[in-house]
Amino acid sequence: MSEATIDSMLKDLPFPSNILNTLREDVLKAGVSKKEMEEIIEKMMEEYATSCIEPCDAAGVVAAQSIGEPGTQMTMRTFHYAGVAEINVTLGLPRLIEIVDARKIPSTPMMTIALSKEHPEDYAYDREKTRALAWEIEATKIDHIADVTTDLSQMKLIIDLHEKAMEGRNITIDQVKEKFNEELNVLVSISPDIDNQIVITPGEPSYRELLQLAKSIHNVTLKGIEGIKRVVVRKEGEEYTLYTEGSALRDVLQFEGVDKTRTSTNNINEIYEVLGIEAARNAIIKEATDTLREQGLTVDIRHIMLVADLMTCDGEVKQIGRHGISGEKASVFARAAFEVTVNHLLDAGMRGDVDQLQGVTENIIVGQPIRMGTGDVHLISRRVEKVEAKELEAEEE
């Protein structure tokens, strides 16, 4: 059987991608016929039907233990070289905690910038274009292109620009001067005697002002995007890709040559702000799955999807914690059982809250059967024949 035939037969099957990929590889190795393939698929569908979730099953508890148990095997290492020698990225348990805590800014924000590749001369295939785009995106500070010295006798800052560094980053002395004029309330002038030298004089001739100014000029972004500390060009297969240390999705998507459909960031809140809640949900699933897979752990994607759905179901990204999902539960006992127990009970008592005892935690606390499995099944009516039989027995007596 050809690969195209196998793909067409597997296309509409309701199985996770990792199972389909394994099946595809095994079928190609074994060289099965079309009839045998149909029998394999039929057997798989039978197994699939028997493995579906039972009514009233505790899906949330199963998801929690399915993610939590592999989580105990994850390493505590924070940094790892993600195939790019110059860029560190947080992985393992610290990264998983960041994802479920919905941190506003990850500890190592990073972007993967895919480049346009529709035509042979596009950015993805041209190293020079890619390198030029990298310099446009990377934040250029004065330290990258110049030496700064403080002249205390003249009360001035002297900036000696490096011509080669300026050429590489495609920036001119006039642009540097203009940027300092915009950002700082000082007198900026180009030295008439020495090439590529800028002289900055503070507004007030005092040592304090001069030292403050010497500190401030290092924070001015002369070119590129604020927050993108470094950009690395890497060739993957036939095309070039950019990896950044720092993240600014909205700004990066504005650049010509960036493929908007394939560019991503590991900052989930930024994805939510730029692309919306559905994109954020997909990012949570992808980041959690990739983090677990990198550690050699396989968790069924449906458990992770359940967590992602819960974090995004209200239209914004919420953490799983007392400031998010756990702190917003309707049940007083469920909130109290998680964290800051006394505060929750006191507040509920003052407000006169009523707990309907619908969930698992609150029923366990008060000693009632939980509403899961057989505990969630109630007798609604009795069969008429049995009722009539009992009535006849009562009459005979």
UniProtKB/Swiss-Prot annotation:
Subcellular location: Cytoplasm
Keywords: Cytoplasm, DNA-binding, DNA-directed RNA polymerase, Nucleotidyltransferase, Transcription, Transferase
Entry keyword Lipid metabolism: no
CDD domains the UniProt entry points to: RNAP_A
SUPFAM superfamilies for the chain: beta and beta-prime subunits of DNA dependent RNA-polymerase
Catalytic reaction equation(s): RNA(n) + a ribonucleoside 5'-triphosphate = RNA(n+1) + diphosphate
One annotated Gene Ontology cellular component of this protein: cytoplasm
Main location: cytoplasm
Source superkingdom: Archaea
Protein name: DNA-directed RNA polymerase subunit Rpo1C
Gene that this sequence comes from: rpo1C
